[in-house]
């Protein structure tokens, strides 16, 4: 009432527990809509940045910009000779979507005699198990490698000219760039070698083998390939390479190992097609991914909190929006609306999962921000800066339902029974908001019609049981079994279609007849030169209409050839974590016993591992178990040294997601939360994506006794090596 509804920022996204009735993604949004609205945090396509901002304009695939991969498991088994796991770790980033199926598939492909090649700076957990060959590349330099491959194909006549002529537009622009471009520098393997760290002979061998054998590229999410500076360039360059070898022909496609059937879309599953696709939206008691005019992209939240003048950007940025949406400009605040004064969040993981986390911690202490309300099952990260934390019940403490239609195993609707009573005062997210509604109704409902019957209007009179039944009756499961039978059995399953082997795989229809089966681009073809980008951003020198080589610029200096590298000589790889889901499970005692999960320092503190190549460790005088600072001009965090040949020289590796343990909030951290020192800048000038991997850092050996004397308050906090810092350090 003091500032207006737009003054409340709602943070309502993230990777939470699987809940439909008691969801953890914006249960408060509807309540605030009943009271006039709020400003939403719009989560940009953080797992798909390069694809969304780049490849989507090349092959038009909606909504994420990744390739069609329907029925590809069958096609690969029959036709593919080589799989390129490019920046892909399908042993780590499957998480709740894929379970063990991606791992089993990779073993199956090997058993079928298919060659597997891993391209990544690190010998990750998938490459260590499945790859026949590892090609280590410097982080965020895949673009140089890709251009050099294209150079070999063009100069040695190793690409499909007929396909390029009939299925693409703008190839002459790519050829111009490969053969010299504006700076007259041919993108030869010898040119690429010092940039990407891959020997010229290896580049040539890879290019020739790819041209000779049916090849499919493979991906999961995360890593420097798709979440770094100008990630739209390697993403759309990969599409160009696939096109040069006849994208869609048997064995030549793009496969993704996770998020199958995402958004109930059968184009995005390499597994046998199901008769129906389950949905859980009918009884979903939280926010939906849709467009609104009152929002801020998640990557711009620090700027939005601290704003004193309007800020602008392009697109709603949420992952379900079509490519055309990226051409529309928005601003915060809207004309005549307030700036931010309050945050209500169920997503307290911004600081350790997004770009420029230190900037966010500074913003949380802006004088204009009056109040931060947080609800969450776990006390992590941003919770340190909340005024009130509402304890949320976990999945095991409530009755709910769930859908498994992304694992590729069985399309299943599940009844999730309550396992235990809620601990202490914990309530579900939905119930927490109901309690707020009750209080508001009690305080204001008698005299103000806005608050009258607020609880009833918020819940629509639904109970847990009626919400489950409503969800079931609109899920497609009701076509196969009754609600009563579902409750008795605890699940309902959707069968595969008969003769699923006959389904055309990937881009085969487009390959066979591009005129009859056009792509959703303006021309209907693969647009190596994007007409949409040319029309809407003719002066954008970072994301041009066609792929171009770009490295150090006024915007980014995160490259080894930049003068900044003299001070900060190592490129940091920060992937999705092997032993966590983002920040979740960072306090798991059993996982912390694994040597690549935590490194116990001389002070007994469990530090986040920093993988360092033996060559670099020798140069720095480091040994296993030493404690180091990971530092750049945005601040520093810490880590425990883990010396291994599994990381390329001049590169260091530290997973993202360690729970922050601030030394000086907004400047330094003990726990290894390296997103704090990631660039605050977005993917490029007109692309509000995150840059959270592939940036420059320095490594400094630390004497833990001396640093404890320097920062006595931070280093005197109580902690348990098998859990982390004690909650008593923070809760009042």
Language-model-detected regions and their locations in the chain:
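Glycine-rich phosphate/diphosphate-binding loops that line cofactor/substrate pockets in enzymes
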Residues: 1-9, 73-83, 184, 204-218, ...
């Amino acid at each position: 009432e003091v500032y207006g509804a737009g003054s409340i920022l709602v943070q309502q996204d993230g990777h939470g527990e699987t809940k439909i009735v008691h969801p953890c993604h914006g249960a408060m949004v509807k309540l605030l809509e009943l009271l006039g609205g709020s400003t939403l945090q719009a989560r940009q396509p953080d797992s798909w940045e390069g694809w969304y901002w780049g490849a989507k304009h090349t092959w038009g695939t909606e909504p994420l910009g990744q390739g069609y991969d329907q029925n590809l498991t069958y096609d690969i088994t029959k036709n593919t000779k080589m799989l390129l796991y490019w920046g892909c770790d399908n042993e780590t980033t499957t998480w709740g979507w894929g379970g063990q199926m991606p791992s089993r598939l990779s073993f199956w492909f090997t058993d079928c005699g298919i060659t597997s090649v891993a391209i990544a700076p690190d010998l990750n957990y998938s490459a260590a198990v499945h790859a026949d060959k590892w090609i280590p590349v410097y982080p965020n330099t895949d673009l140089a490698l890709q251009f050099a491959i294209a150079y070999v194909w063009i100069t040695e006549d190793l690409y499909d000219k007929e396909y390029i002529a009939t299925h693409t537009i703008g190839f002459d622009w790519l050829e111009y760039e490969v053969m010299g471009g504006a700076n007259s520098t041919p993108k030869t393997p010898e040119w690429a070698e010092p940039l990407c760290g891959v020997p010229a002979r290896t580049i040539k061998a890879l290019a020739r083998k790819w041209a000779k054998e049916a090849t499919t590229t493979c991906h999961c999410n995360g890593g420097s390939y798709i979440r770094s500076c100008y990630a739209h360039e390697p993403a759309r360059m990969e599409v160009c390479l696939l096109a040069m070898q006849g994208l869609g022909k048997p064995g030549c496609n793009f496969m993704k190992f996770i998020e199958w059937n995402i958004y109930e879309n059968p184009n995005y599953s390499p597994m046998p097609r199901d008769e129906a696709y389950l949905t859980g939206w009918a009884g979903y008691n939280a926010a939906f991914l849709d467009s609104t005019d009152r929002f801020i992209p998640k990557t711009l939240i620090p700027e939005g909190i601290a704003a004193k003048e309007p800020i602008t950007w392009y697109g709603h940025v949420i992952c379900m929006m079509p490519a055309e949406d990226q051409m529309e400009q928005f601003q915060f605040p809207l004309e005549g609306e307030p700036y931010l004064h309050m945050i209500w969040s169920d997503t307290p993981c911004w600081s350790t999962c997004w770009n420029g986390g230190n900037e966010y911690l500074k913003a949380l202490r802006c004088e204009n921000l009056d109040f931060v309300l947080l609800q969450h099952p776990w006390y992590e990260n941003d919770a340190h800066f909340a005024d009130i934390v509402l304890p949320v019940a976990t999945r095991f403490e409530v009755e709910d339902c769930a859908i498994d239609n992304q694992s590729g195993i069985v399309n299943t609707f599940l009844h999730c029974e309550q396992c235990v009573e809620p601990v202490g005062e914990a309530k579900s997210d939905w119930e927490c908001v109901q309690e707020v509604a009750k209080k508001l109704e009690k305080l204001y409902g008698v005299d103000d019609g806005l608050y009258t019957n607020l609880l009833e209007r918020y819940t629509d009179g639904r109970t847990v049981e009626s919400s489950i039944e409503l969800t079931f009756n609109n899920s497609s499961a009701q076509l196969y079994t009754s609600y009563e039978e579902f409750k008795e059995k605890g699940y309902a399953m959707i069968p595969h279609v008969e003769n699923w082997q006959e389904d055309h795989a990937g881009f085969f229809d487009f390959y066979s007849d591009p005129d009859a089966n056009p792509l959703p681009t303006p021309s209907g073809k693969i647009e190596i030169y994007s007409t949409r980008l040319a029309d809407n951003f003719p002066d954008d020198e970072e994301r041009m209409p066609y792929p171009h080589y770009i490295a150090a610029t006024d915007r980014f200096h995160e490259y080894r050839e930049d003068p900044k590298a003299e001070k900060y000589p190592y490129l940091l790889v920060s992937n999705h974590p092997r032993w966590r889901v983002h920040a979740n499970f960072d306090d798991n005692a059993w996982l912390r016993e694994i040597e690549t999960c935590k490194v116990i320092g001389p002070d007994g503190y469990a530090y986040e591992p920093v993988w360092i190549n033996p060559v670099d460790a020798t140069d720095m005088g480091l040994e296993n178990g030493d404690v180091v600072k990971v530092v750049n001009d945005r601040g520093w965090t810490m880590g425990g040294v883990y010396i291994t040949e599994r990381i390329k020289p001049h590169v260091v590796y530290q997973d993202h997601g360690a729970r922050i343990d601030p030394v000086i909030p907004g400047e330094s951290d003990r726990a290894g939360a390296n997103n704090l020192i990631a660039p605050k800048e977005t993917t490029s000038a007109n692309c509000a994506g995150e840059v959270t991997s592939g940036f420059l850092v320095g490594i400094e050996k630390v004497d833990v006794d001396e640093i404890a004397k320097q920062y006595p308050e931070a280093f005197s906090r109580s902690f348990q090596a098998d859990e982390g810092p004690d909650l008593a350090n923070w809760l009042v």
